[in-house]
Regions:
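N-terminal pre-domain/capping segments
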Residues: 2-141, 158-161, 168, 175, ...
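Acidic/histidine-rich catalytic cores of soluble enzymes
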Residues: 73-74, 168-222
């Protein structure tokens, strides 16, 4: 992929049981740090076509970021991990160290909606993301990105309650590891900036934030 095409496509701004909470106590655990504000990182989704075509694997990501693009940080997509066993993660961590790469965050898809309209859905959302909190901490990432859409035409006030419940449960789990939980505007209520501000105020947690997608915001996202 040419560098120009890569930059245009990325706009880079800087199952259960595979890995459990025991990793939080592992002697190889990375210290969770936020990246420098003036640095940039590569979002793995920008290279998804090459990955799906089999040109390289997740374990190669640190090398690709350093040798092809000369950047210092990488942002993972959870669905592009092969099988995240502890041995696999150790190799990935070593690859990043060998190439001087900071692993910034993990973008999580297919793990539930942060605006589920049932208590069961809210609880399951939090449970599903726990393993990615553990993996993020092990790798030294500082955040996990989530999706928060809600049912179509959901009442915005009710949606605030649903999401606050879901994210408070997840944040309770991520707090000991100091892993931030962030929302990307990927449709539904997350495309409403006023609603997002209200959710941030309602949850009121320093580990809770946003991860704006500036490429294709909805008409109401300003």
């Amino acid at each position: 992929m040419k560098r120009r095409k890569f930059i245009e496509s990325s706009i880079v701004l800087g199952a259960a049981g595979l890995v459990g909470p025991s990793l939080l106590k592992n002697e190889l655990m990375s210290e969770t740090k936020s990246p420098p504000r003036d640095d940039i990182s590569v979002a793995q989704w920008a290279l998804v076509e090459e990955i799906r075509a089999g040109k390289w694997k997740n374990l190669d990501f640190p090398k690709i970021a350093r040798e092809d693009f000369g950047v210092n940080g990488i942002e993972f997509v959870n669905t592009l991990f092969e099988v995240p066993t502890e041995d696999y993660l150790r190799k990935l961590k070593q690859n990043a160290k060998d190439h001087g790469i900071t692993m910034v965050l993990i973008m999580c898809d297919a793990e539930g909606d942060g605006c589920a309209d049932t208590r069961e859905g809210q609880k399951q959302f939090a449970i599903n993301h726990r393993k990615w909190v553990d993996i993020a901490h092990y790798l030294g990432c500082h955040a996990v990105r989530t999706n928060c859409r809600g049912p179509q035409n959901a009442d915005k006030k009710e949606a605030l309650k649903w999401s606050a419940d879901a994210y408070n449960q997840l944040l309770e789990y991520s707090k000991p590891a100091s892993i931030s939980i962030v929302i990307e505007n990927h449709g539904g209520v997350s495309n409403d900036p006023d609603w997002m501000v209200e959710l941030m105020k309602k949850v009121n947690n320093p580990l809770f934030g946003t991860y704006p997608d500036w490429r294709s915001p909805s008409k109401e996202f300003d």
